[in-house]
Amino acid sequence: MKALSKLKAEKGIWLVDAPKPVMGHNDLLIKIKKTAICGTDMHIYNWDEWSQKTIPVPMVVGHEYVGEVVDIGQEVRGFKIGDRVSGEGHITCGHCRNCRAGRTHLCRNTSGVGVNREGSFAEYLVIPAFNAFKIPDDISDDLASIFDPFGNAVHTALSFDLVGEDVLITGAGPIGIMAAAVCRHVGARHVVITDVNEYRLELARKMGATRAVNVSKESLKDVMKELGMTEGFDVGLEMSGVPSAFHAMLDTMNHGGKVAMLGIPGGEMAIDWSKVIFKGLVIKGIYGREMFETWYKMASLIQSGLDISPIITHHFKIDDFQQGFDAMGSGQSGKVILSWD
């Protein structure tokens, strides 16, 4: 089968002929229709320090996808051949304390599809049936293929009550932009998103952000004054991993504010903890998606009218994968879809 593999311990990704994955008794065999390129895939493509420590070579990568069930393990119940599915990319152990308590997204033994095991940049993928999510008929393949990052946005945004609240999002990558759309959809008052990438900020405006602020040109505090905000942001969503962005968030949070952190800093990050203490801030770390509450909320948000389609800016056939990675790496894109049909 065709697959995109991290074939060598160097920058790049390669289109190869790979063996079809072998299915176990509790697994589904999925014929991939569309995949999306994630920021994690770009780290692997660029072969950065994290990738060098984490990714076995060679390995098929990728973890954002939609496909069709074409075979079912003999112990599987609840799925049938022809079901259209996406899937949770975090494979959990099922026996640690968090798994047994229903907090599977916090499993300490998590294995990542396309990170620790064969991924979805291939004509076929095998995953445990437990991890598969049936896609409703009224949700397109394009949207289903980005459910993984959309889930990060939903999990982060819905960590705290948003109705009537003022929200600051630092980092206008695709996940931050989708989080802005979620916040507006569920009833936040002002949703302000910051970045220095004007292309991405314009996407955020299209997706409903109240203000998309280029912090290299405009002061966040000036924007707050323009919006009539006198007390600070009630909710902060840190999506960038950039220390200066998080510092700006701490400076502008209201007393009693709540912060959800998804962005991963490149190294240790010092902050002024007195601001956290004296403002009484709550900080919550976010990893992945809640299984499977986030997935049902994703589908329901789209079915209730949330439109995240503007975040998808590029489509390529799999044979043109290099153009897709180039587009994603340029910073002048939203989500990039690769078609396997």
Swiss-Prot record:
Its EC number is 1.1.1.103. This is L-threonine 3-dehydrogenase. Zn(2+) 1 binds at residues 38, 63-64. Its main location: cytoplasm. NAD(+) binds at residues 175, 195, 200, 262-264, 286-287. InterPro entries: ADH-like_C, ADH-like_N, ADH_Zn_CS, GroES-like_sf, L-Threonine_3-DHase, NAD(P)-bd_dom_sf, PKS_ER, Zn_alcohol_dh. Pfam families: ADH_N, ADH_zinc_N. It comes from the Bacteria. Pathway: Amino-acid degradation; L-threonine degradation via oxydo-reductase pathway; glycine from L-threonine: step 1/2. It is found in: Cytoplasm.
